[in-house]
């Protein structure tokens, strides 16, 4: 096991070269050369579930897990790269896991939120605000039943000293205690939890961490318009690369270990 890893993280230059017209088609990708102390890096596994209620989303995710995530996890364990598991807190899956770090209370997590405004009725679209609610989906109970006993993927479980976090503040306090500055992300879904969780790429970038997305260790929630070319997935990764974050592929990380 080496003391550092050499990576060439990719980003998107919203710039043009000297002498070139300022138009979008003249912008493009670029790479940096980083030599990162191994002790300052962690792999964050976001919401790697055992299923999804949309069948093709589930199939893509399972293929990513089997072909990309599992080999990467094995390489990281062998190479000494820390792995942090971040399942969603909603079902208490993180909090009930024996590996949960338990560094923050739910009261602390909610402390900064204004509970009075917007009013609870407005948030819940009830009472005088009921007219603004989306219609009830006729198959929503069926959807809920399909994921009622959702769990962390059986092949992507914490081992040894690997920890589980439930909240962004958990992740931050743990990283602070370990001196971790670089967070490499994998998991699901690219355009949802990877972007929007408080332990996800955007919020942890706001806290000052360097963020690297593993672009072949994820897939997004596609629409009928984006499904064929996976433009939700690709667009979410490009969003990160355009706005201060980076990406690599799993084989690059494995080769660096």
Regions found by a protein language model. Name each.
Residues 49-54:
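Short acidic, Gly/Ser-rich segments with clustered Asp/Glu that frequently serve as metal-coordination loops
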Residues 46:
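Active-site flanking residues adjacent to catalytic metal/cofactor-binding acidic residues
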Residues 86:
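Aromatic-lined carbohydrate-recognition surfaces of secreted/lumenal glycan-active proteins
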Residues 65:
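Aromatic/His-enriched, Gly/Pro-containing loop or helix-boundary segments
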Residues 83:
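Active-/binding-site microenvironments in catalytic and ligand-binding cores
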Residues 1-42, 55, 59-61, 70-71, ...:
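Active-site-adjacent betaalpha module
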């Amino acid at each position: 096991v080496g003391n550092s890893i050499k990576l060439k993280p990719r980003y998107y230059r919203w710039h043009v070269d000297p002498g070139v017209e300022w138009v979008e088609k003249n912008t493009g990708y670029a790479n940096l050369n980083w030599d990162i102390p191994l002790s300052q890096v962690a792999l964050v596994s976001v919401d790697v579930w055992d299923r999804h209620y949309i069948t093709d989303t589930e199939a893509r995710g399972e293929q990513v897990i089997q072909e990309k995530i599992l080999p990467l996890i094995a390489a990281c364990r062998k190479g000494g790269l820390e792995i942090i598991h971040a399942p969603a807190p909603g079902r208490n899956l993180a909090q009930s896991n024996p590996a949960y770090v338990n560094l923050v209370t739910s009261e602390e997590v909610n402390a900064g939120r204004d509970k009075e405004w917007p009013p609870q009725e407005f948030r819940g679209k009830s009472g005088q605000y009921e007219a603004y609610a989306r219609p009830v989906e006729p198959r929503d109970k069926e959807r809920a039943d399909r994921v009622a006993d959702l769990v962390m993927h059986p092949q992507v479980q914490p081992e040894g000293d690997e920890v589980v976090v439930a909240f962004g503040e958990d992740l931050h306090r743990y990283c602070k205690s370990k001196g971790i500055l670089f967070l490499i992300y994998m998991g699901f879904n690219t355009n949802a939890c990877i972007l929007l969780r408080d332990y996800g790429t955007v919020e942890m970038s706001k806290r000052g961490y360097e963020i690297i997305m593993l672009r072949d260790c994820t897939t997004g929630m596609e629409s009928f318009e984006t499904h064929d070319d996976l433009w939700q997935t690709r667009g979410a990764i490009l969003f990160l690369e355009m706005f201060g974050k980076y990406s690599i592929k799993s084989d690059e990380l494995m080769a660096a270990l």
